[in-house]
């Protein structure tokens, strides 16, 4: 399913004709340039590889420079891939713009969530705190028991414990497109999308729409 690579600009609000305020996230989608077309015969699956934005020349290594030069496209800030459905055809060097979403009502947005560093179980997993008083000493935000005794004699995999929180790939599904601004290459999406301002996001038509 074809999507677009954008950059999260921030949040604002727009008003309907009735005066209702809608909170929106602004996503800037510069033209996505196709750097490679993968086919069933040569690669084992059908997909397009796209790049977006720009990158300083001294930040582009030789492998990337050769790859972009072969495709005849300007080096971008990264490379992303979209699987192709049956019968879809694209040419290397062509561009994808926000107009791809003119007829789309709902989208799924994927980004990298804000990193929170090492966090305890209360913040990371919404554990309840223990008593502040009534004889409780130094165990107010402690997780409590993490298992049983000699049997099984170990902590089960997946046990919710303190650790690194955030900075992981997150997808928010079924967000509504409020406006497509083709002149300024902007998508206005209702609600919040994952990640920090300036972060890369992948916008695709909703799979559950």
Curated annotation (Swiss-Prot):
Pfam families assigned: Ribosomal_L3 (PF00297)
UniProt GO cellular component terms: cytosolic large ribosomal subunit
SUPFAM superfamilies (UniProt xref): Translation proteins
Keywords, ordered alphabetically: Methylation, Ribonucleoprotein, Ribosomal protein, RNA-binding, rRNA-binding
Processing after translation: Methylated by PrmB.
A GO molecular-function annotation: rRNA binding
Keyword Mitochondrion tagged: no
Modified residues (N5-methylglutamine): 150
Function per UniProt: One of the primary rRNA binding proteins, it binds directly near the 3'-end of the 23S rRNA, where it nucleates assembly of the 50S subunit.
Complex formation: Part of the 50S ribosomal subunit. Forms a cluster with proteins L14 and L19.
NCBIfam families documented for this protein: L3_bact
UniProt protein name: Large ribosomal subunit protein uL3
Species this protein is from: Vibrio vulnificus (strain YJ016)
